[in-house]
Amino acid sequence: MSTNDTRIYLASGSPRRREILEQLGLHLERIHADIDESVRPGEDAVAYTERLAREKAEAGWRVVSSCGLPERPLLAADTTVSQDGEIFGKPEDADDARRMLRAFSGRSHQAITSVAVRDGGKLLVKTSITDVFFKSLSDAEIERYIASGEPFDKAGAYGIQGKAGVFVEHIEGSYTGVMGLPVHETALLLAEFGFELP
């Protein structure tokens, strides 16, 4: 089954996810879905990211149902960063951002993005894991980046598509996954709901 309808719901406020989906030719209606993003005891980064993507999709679908909106696929995603078993979410403040960037300096870490699509009773999840290798960062570079304000709404305190791109020596995996929505996995998921991309 394929569909000519390019409309989906997006349970995310991320401008990067919106931009990626629009570049794929999709038309989006944003759904606000709040969930508790606390890490559970013993939960690893992949399990955590997949759970949050699934819970965001479920919460978004409840909004669609309770508001009587037309049924169409709803996409949600979650991104986290992990290094040596530690989960790095969005920094709480400048000190937290500084701690994260120092941890990544001269080392690799993983950017993990899980994507969930829900339509009716069907919910599917796919995950992208990318190894990101940072150059060694000077204190001055870290301070300039923090002063830019860019780290504060991003998992791991950086955005690869922004000023922090200069910190990245190379990646092994999905660039769009590090941005917050892996195009390959997203297209595979949407194909399961009848979308033919591109």
From Swiss-Prot:
Q: Which GO terms describe its biological process?
A: nucleotide metabolic process
Question: Gene3D superfamilies of this UniProt entry?
Answer: 3.90.950.10
Return the GO cellular component terms, semicolon-separated.
Answer: cytoplasm
Q: Which Pfam families does the UniProt entry name for this protein?
A: Maf
**What positions are marked as the site Important for substrate specificity?**
16, 79, 161
Q: Name one GO molecular function term.
A: UTP diphosphatase activity
Q: Which CDD domains match?
A: Maf
Q: Which family does it belong to?
A: Belongs to the Maf family. YhdE subfamily.
Q: What is this protein called?
A: dTTP/UTP pyrophosphatase
Give the originating organism: Chromobacterium violaceum (strain ATCC 12472 / DSM 30191 / JCM 1249 / CCUG 213 / NBRC 12614 / NCIMB 9131 / NCTC 9757 / MK)
